[in-house]
Amino acid sequence: MAVRKDTKNGKWLAEVYVNGNASRKWFLTKGDALRFYNQAKEQTTSAVDSVQVLESSDLPALSFYVQEWFDLHGKTLSDGKARLAKLKNLCSNLGDPPANEFNAKIFADYRKRRLDGEFSVNKNNPPKEATVNREHAYLRAVFNELKSLRKWTTENPLDGVRLFKERETELAFLYERDIYRLLAECDNSRNPDLGLIVRICLATGARWSEAETLTQSQVMPYKITFTNTKSKKNRTVPISKELFDMLPKKRGRLFNDAYESFENAVLRAEIELPKGQLTHVLRHTFASHFMMNGGNILVLKEILGHSTIEMTMRYAHFAPSHLESAVKFNPLSNPAQ
């Protein structure tokens, strides 16, 4: 058994070996570490070594800091658990090196292998640059957050590593004829809630999960308030009287899960969508038609709940007047004298 201090993070690690099994726990003080050790010693009949206090420059593995980030900050994020799972998988792919040995070169080598499909189930279908960039951003954020909390005292090992340039993905949206076909198939579904969920998404620009998990308390005459949003900010969007009258008048959650039913409805409607945009096409459709009908980009930002205008600007080109001066001032229409 041993109690040792990490000289970089200032914490104390108590290591207890009972019948060949190791139990390790970190403490803020030496006293707490020793108490843990003494309690463990009393609970075992195995022979143990005397306590040793060791100075060590070794840091825990990368996954230790990922878990620490989650415990101190990540669990407050709406996607915290999903992000933790991705980060743990990333640590595993990296071989979970000691955190003080992890550096930009190790990550750069990993990115190359990742894009080559080495860690993919199907090596012929490697991830896109966007996927690797998300991993990069997540891990960089771990070190930045821990540094701000004084849990990581050296430089961020990913400082200076640039993200890959990404191709802009197509934002698919539905035309009027597509909407009619889709709604018809949704209304014919065995899931009685599907048509209403889809109508809410199309009428408000809500994300699928926001509409699917609506409760009675979020609906008031001609308005819906979306909570538990991606930005963690509530937003209220007006709806028509017609849509309001269609919604169930009951307490608690209004709808059952309908994702699989929606997927089947899209197939029956023979609508082809880009990969990864199955339900999000409804949100894109709202935003695209909002701008095509002359809506204001700043108002759209508030309706969608975007944190920055840059996110909303993806829809600016749908505005009727967007870059219309190209028609007026091009050399075919108006050659310079």
From Swiss-Prot:
Superkingdom of origin organism: Viruses
The enzyme's E.C. designation: 2.7.7.-, 3.1.-.-
Stated role: Integrase is necessary for integration of the phage into the host genome by site-specific recombination. In conjunction with excisionase, integrase is also necessary for excision of the prophage from the host genome.
TM spans (from-to): none
Originating organism: Haemophilus phage HP1 (strain HP1c1)
Subunit composition and interactions: Homodimer.
PROSITE patterns: CB, TYR_RECOMBINASE
Family indicated by similarity: Belongs to the 'phage' integrase family.
Residue ranges of every copy of the Core-binding (CB) domain listed in the record: 60-147
Gene Ontology MF terms: DNA binding; hydrolase activity; transferase activity
Annotated PANTHER family: FELS-2 PROPHAGE PROTEIN, PHAGE INTEGRASE-RELATED
Name of the protein in its database record: Integrase
GO biological process: DNA integration; DNA recombination; establishment of integrated proviral latency; symbiont entry into host cell; viral genome integration into host DNA
Active site, UniProt feature: 207, 230, 280, 283, 306, 315 (o-(3'-phospho-dna)-tyrosine intermediate)
Keyword terms: DNA integration, DNA recombination, DNA-binding, Hydrolase, Transferase, Viral genome integration, Virus entry into host cell
